[in-house]
Structure formats: structure tokens, C-alpha cells
Amino acid sequence: MELDYRRLGKAYRAQHIQLSGELIMNDLEIFFYENPGNEINKWMHYFEIYDRYFSKYRGTDVHVVEFGVSQGGSLQMWKNYFGDKAKIYGIDINPLCKQLEEDQIEIFIGDQEDRKFLKSLGEAIPRIDILIDDGGHTMSQQINTFEEMFPYIDKNGVYLCEDLVTSDWQKHGGGYKKKRHLHRIQ
């Protein structure tokens, strides 16, 4: 596979180039670079983490929930990665995201701040094997989503919350002096 190495950051190149000079990428990274569909917004270091924890679900009837639909590209990536048996659920506050539904991909419209919505979502989805919180990124959204959705995750499932750094940002309702700061949750 030919890549434009200018698109890859120095740290990323160093991390993925073996002594032979060969660039090694997992299937998610390859999909990201060859993506024929909708835009995908992901930090590059997540792909290795995804593959490490999600690969055991490939080719199974996995149920994946992702908060934060945006352009829908990551939902298409999950569909491609997990295969024909997978069921992908996207959750977003923007009603226009509903237009991104396709075979194997269902989208729910609602607010991550709304605990009633989250509870109804957990009841509406028959099973959750993987939940990815890449939604609004405010501390309260991350905490509400975890508290309301974690009980619905399969006992052997995976709960992955992205961009926790925003919990330290005041503009996202965070800050280390806040009573509900993530470091204080035990």
C-alpha cells in the first residue's frame, strides 16, 4: 500500500516503521487512509487501542454503540471492520445524522446530558458488546453516559471513553477542583 508519508506525523511514523523500513498498520488504520466513504475524525493512536480490544469481536454478531456520529465515517469503519454480522448503533444530538443510516447501521437522536434518553437507549438496544463514547466530551456527558449505560454492557464487553482530557477543561465543565472530577470518581 502506498502512503503519503507527509500525512503521517513523525511520532506516528516512528511508532509504525519496523527496522526493515516497512510501515505496519492494522485494518482500521488502512481503512482510515483508504476511506472511500464519509469523513472519519479519530486520533491516530486510538487505532492500535481499538484493534487490541475489539479484534476478538471480528466476524461475530457484535453490537457496537458509538456516541458521536459526526459525518458517519467511523460507523462505516466499524461496519467494515466487524463484518456482515455486526450491528452498529450511532447516537448523536444532531437530527441530520439520522440520514446516515444504512444496512447494519441504526442511528438514535438524543442528548447525552439527558439521563432518561440514555436509559431508554439502553432498553432499546438488545445487547451492547462495545460502547465507544466519542460524543460531546463534557465531563457531565461522560459521567452521565457511563453511569446510565455501563449496566447495559455485556459482562465481557468493552466500554471505551475517548478524549478524557476534556474533563480537565473548564469550557467543558471540567477542572481538577470540581467535585465530580474524574480523578475523584472511585
Specify the residue positions occupied by each region the protein language model found.
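A short alpha-helical cap/connector motif
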Residues: 1-132, 136-161, 165-186
